[in-house]
Swiss-Prot record:
NCBIfam families: PRK09547.1. The lineage of its organism: Bacteria, Pseudomonadati, Pseudomonadota, Gammaproteobacteria, Cellvibrionales. The keyword Transport applies. It is found in: Cell inner membrane. GO terms for molecular function: sodium:proton antiporter activity. This is Na(+)/H(+) antiporter NhaB. Belongs to the NhaB Na(+)/H(+) (TC 2.A.34) antiporter family. Its main location: membrane. It is a multi-pass membrane protein.
Length: 499
């Protein structure tokens, strides 16, 4: 209990986070004031490093609060403006719509997803085959849907599996309220199996998450920056696929081979198998659910399955923006499954809205990068090189910058600079196409290195699943490292060989 008002304010500041973390954030705020007076450029780079720190410490404190304080200070210090932040948010409004509605739509589909994936998980005993399936299916889906949507599905499935076993391990009855984020009631007998199960889920989720990048690089609709680059280059769906195939196909093969090697060797946190005791619990759960499933439950599953088909076709044919399709899914699922209570509907939005707010804070950091021209020296350096070396260097530069910033922003900056060079007659149309391919590959493949680069990875890191399976920023970086090396090497090699 705080003994004074000063102690009370300190206790309330960032809540239950450790004192060293609170002092670090305050230190950042003080340092930024000094740096902004010396060099706004340096202050901008300091802000990027500080924001990455808040992401890395996501399990200590949700990054929205410390990151938000840093973003507010950046505006107050003049490193960017409220108008610039608004412009960045507006430019990414499609992503915000997606998070608001599509993730909530997936929430209302979780019974069907858990049903399908339970059958898959229990039907395939080989962890290697299961991992390859997760990675390949995620890649195929991401090529036609959206990486965030696919990640939301993976998260919903993993949370469902985890909750089933955690309830059993805690001795909680099926009908009772249960907090699967608390381990206080987990019996000692089940703790080892629970830890192994966490490791099992971590590896599957990371294989699936990287799979979204493998598929995302291949098609026009795979990632938001693909659409942007294709629009400027004038490529349609088929042209985009064909021009990217010399990179995307080897990357997919390399990614799947990496998946297999990781599961065979067990390095970097992979290789954990589903414990027999956990499998039995899931088998029993599936039998109980099947036995008690009445006509009402079956009707709900059927509705969810039909709406899932509608979702796939609507996204693949791009009938509307992804977020609006998400709203369509919410309306269809709640209307035909009788979910009309406002509080029940509200639960669906709990997962995505904190992350949506965090993403807006991230866009404030992107606004600082833009206004302070933090990436300009790198761009100028690459464009000053001889043409033969530009494509590989564009791939490397885009890859490195996408590891610390949003890959959509990096792609936007680079493709606009290249377009300006083409319009000025500095480069030919053929060379412009080569650089556009290098930019697209560079922002898609190496950006799996950290959660900063891809919105889907950042969403996974800050989701309700991450603390359950002990998936921290550092753990994600370590688990992504083999993929980063392979995809970076394959991508760079393909750019050099084929372009």
């Amino acid at each position: 209990m705080p003994q004074s008002m000063t102690n009370a304010f300190w206790h309330n500041f960032l809540g239950h986070t450790p004192n060293w973390y609170k002092k670090t954030i305050l230190g950042f705020l003080v340092i930024n004031i000094v740096l902004s007076q010396v060099s706004p450029f340096l202050a901008g780079w300091a802000l990027i490093i500080e924001f990455i720190f808040t992401l890395a410490m996501a399990l200590k404190c949700y990054p929205l609060q410390p990151g938000g304080l840093l973003a507010i200070q950046a505006v107050l210090l003049g490193l960017t403006s409220a108008d610039s932040v608004y412009h960045e948010v507006l430019a990414n409004f499609k992503v915000i719509l997606l998070l608001m509605f599509m993730v909530a739509g997936i929430y209302f589909m979780k019974d069907m997803l858990l049903f399908v994936f339970t059958k898959i998980l229990l039907g395939i005993r080989s962890k290697l085959l299961l991992s390859l399936l997760f990675s390949f299916v995620a890649a195929v889906l991401s090529a036609f849907l959206d990486a965030l949507t696919v990640t939301a599905v993976l998260i919903a499935v993993a949370v469902g599996f985890y909750a089933v076993y955690h309830r059993f391990a805690s001795g909680s009855g099926h009908g009772n309220d249960h907090d699967h984020s608390a381990d206080d009631n987990v019996h000692d007998l089940h703790r080892e199996d629970l830890d192994t199960f966490r490791s099992f889920l971590r590896s599957l989720i990371m294989h699936g998450a990287v799979g979204t990048a493998l598929g995302g690089v291949a098609t026009l609709v795979g990632e938001p920056q693909n659409l942007l680059i294709a629009e400027i280059a004038g490529w349609n769906f088929i042209e985009f696929y064909l021009v990217m195939a010399p990179i995307s196909v080897p990357a997919l093969i390399g990614g799947l081979l990496t998946c297999a090697i990781l599961e065979k060797t067990g390095i970097c946190g992979y290789g954990a198998k589903l414990p027999d005791s956990v499998r039995q619990i899931l088998v029993d759960f599936d039998k109980k659910e099947t036995a008690k499933r009445g006509f009402g439950d079956k009707a709900q599953l059927l509705v969810q399955a039909v709406v899932a088909v509608v979702l796939v076709f609507a996204l693949a044919l791009h009938l509307a923006e992804v977020g609006l399709i998400g709203l369509l899914i919410i309306v269809l699922l709640t209307a035909f499954n009788g979910i009309t209570d406002e509080h029940r509907i509200g639960h669906a939005f709990e997962e995505a809205l904190p992350f949506t707010a965090l993403l807006v804070v991230f866009f404030a950091v992107v606004a600082v990068i833009h206004d302070q021209h933090l990436f300009t020296p790198v761009i100028d350096y690459v464009l000053a090189m001889e043409q033969g070396a530009q494509a590989p260097m564009f791939f490397v530069a885009n890859g490195v910058l996408s590891m610390i910033s949003d890959n959509v922003f990096v792609a936007t900056v680079y493709i606009n600079e290249v377009k300006a060079a083409f319009d000025a007659g500095t480069i030919s149309r053929e060379h412009f196409d080569v650089l556009a391919v290098a930019i697209n590959a560079g922002t898609n493949l190496p950006s799996v290195a950290t959660p900063n680069g891809q919105a889907a990875f950042l969403f996974l890191l800050t989701s309700a699943l991450a603390p359950l399976i002990r998936l921290s920023y550092g753990k994600m970086v370590i688990m992504a490292l083999p993929y980063t090396i392979v995809l970076g090497a394959v991508g760079l090699g393909s750019v050099i060989l084929f372009y």
